[in-house]
Amino acid sequence: MKFVDEASILVVAGDGGNGCVSFRREKYIPKGGPDGGDGGDGGDVWMEADENLNTLIDYRFEKSFRAERGQNGASRDCTGKRGKDVTIKVPVGTRVIDQGTGETMGDMTKHGQRLLVAKGGWHGLGNTRFKSSVNRTPRQKTNGTPGDKRDLLLELMLLADVGMLGMPNAGKSTFIRAVSAAKPKVADYPFTTLVPSLGVVRMDSEKSFVVADIPGLIEGAAEGAGLGIRFLKHLERCRVLLHLIDIDPIDGSDPVENARIIIGELEKYSQDLAAKPRWLVFNKIDLMDKSEAEEKAKAIAEALGWEGKYYLISAASQLGVKDLCWDVMTFIIENPIAQAEEAKQPEKVEFMWDDYHRQQLAEVEEDADDDWDDDWDEDDEEGVEFIYKR
């Protein structure tokens, strides 16, 4: 199935049903009073995370989702039926953004998580709600309010513990094939990897982590060059980044300059991403003697001003790969996801009409105090009749 990690959709919640103006009329009960019922609330639109999905391709074709309108109220104090909700299922890891305001409405990070993205309109009030001691035949009612309408941007961001980055042909796909059951395409030309892939690295029966492979970065990636800019966002949720460096590039390029390009593109894209823990991993050491590889790796690290630990591996022959994976596993165990980050609240999104009923009833009460006989006229059989005799 084609990997699609962005989609724009329109969500429209249902309008609220209108209130009803009605008076009870039955045999022997000519003046039964108001009995108009309220309308029904409009249906809501929800997002739900589903671990069985892994792409947003469905929303390239179906772009509009509308909840059902609430039914109008009826006589005999009958309340209108509430509109049916609409639930949109998205892959775990989807971020929901309101395109109109730029607000992030929420991150769908757990299976079964639900997020309200469009709230249905409030029901209108029937005339029964407006009766009082001074207004026994109210002809007021309120209409239902419109439901929320939003243009949403869905961004799928892979959930992985470890992210891999590097220049094209650095050996990222070969590495993920060596440590997991994932089988991304491997070839001797740049940009063999066109879409991100995930692999589960199982260290033993109880310990494992997920590694993400994205297309290689090139200079100018943060401005849109190559494929990297589309997929850098998939590294935002990783806990550690493995920066693979081809220790002996076949094209004769300088490994130091290649590494600086990657670092520069990370900083241009996001300071938060650039600040993540990043490990240097020198790949393809099987192409030279061990001592030569160690000397070259040391020289590159010094040129980059690298003071931390670095690794020498050969993904093709799996030399040094096991030790690297165990160190990654230890780091993940010792650095669990921060509770504050896990419980991070989305930006508060205001929904329309939250105080609608309270405001409407307050206005009616004010009007009743100022002019309590507004609803009476000469043809009103329910009104009070005054006869003056001189």
UniProtKB/Swiss-Prot annotation:
Cofactor field: Mg(2+)
Protein name per Swiss-Prot or TrEMBL: GTPase Obg
First-tier enzyme category under EC: hydrolase
Subunit structure and binding partners: Monomer.
HAMAP family, alphabetized: GTPase_Obg
Domain named Obg: residues: 1-159
Main location per the UniProt record: cytoplasm
Cellular location(s): Cytoplasm
Gene from which this protein is expressed: obg
